[in-house]
């Protein structure tokens, strides 16, 4: 979701969440957007 497997839309989505610094695509087919602090 959130644009994956493209990292950029996922990263932007995560940056919009308070307390999150960004994100990346992970999971079996890089389809899960994972946010990091």
Curated annotation (Swiss-Prot):
Cellular compartments per GO CC:
extracellular region
Using the UniProt record, give the first listed, main subcellular location: secreted
For this protein, the record's PROSITE patterns field holds: INVERT_DEFENSINS
**Record's InterPro entries?**
Defensin_invertebrate/fungal, Scorpion_toxin-like_sf
**Keyword annotations of the record:** Antibiotic, Antimicrobial, Defensin, Disulfide bond, Secreted
Q: Does the entry feature the keyword Iron, yes or no?
A: no
The reply to whether Secreted figures as a keyword in the UniProt entry is yes
One Pfam family cited in the UniProt record for this chain: Defensin_2
Protein's cellular compartments: Secreted
Q: GO biological process: what's one of them?
A: defense response to bacterium
Disulphide-bonded residues:
4-25, 10-33, 14-35
Name the protein family: Belongs to the invertebrate defensin family. Type 2 subfamily.
Q: What does this protein do?
A: Has antibacterial activity against M.luteus and E.coli.
The protein's name: Defensin-A
Organism of origin: Mytilus edulis (Blue mussel)
């Amino acid at each position: 979701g959130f644009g994956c497997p493209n990292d950029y839309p996922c990263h932007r989505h995560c940056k919009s969440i308070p307390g999150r610094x960004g994100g990346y695509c992970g999971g079996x087919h890089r389809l899960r957007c994972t946010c990091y602090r």
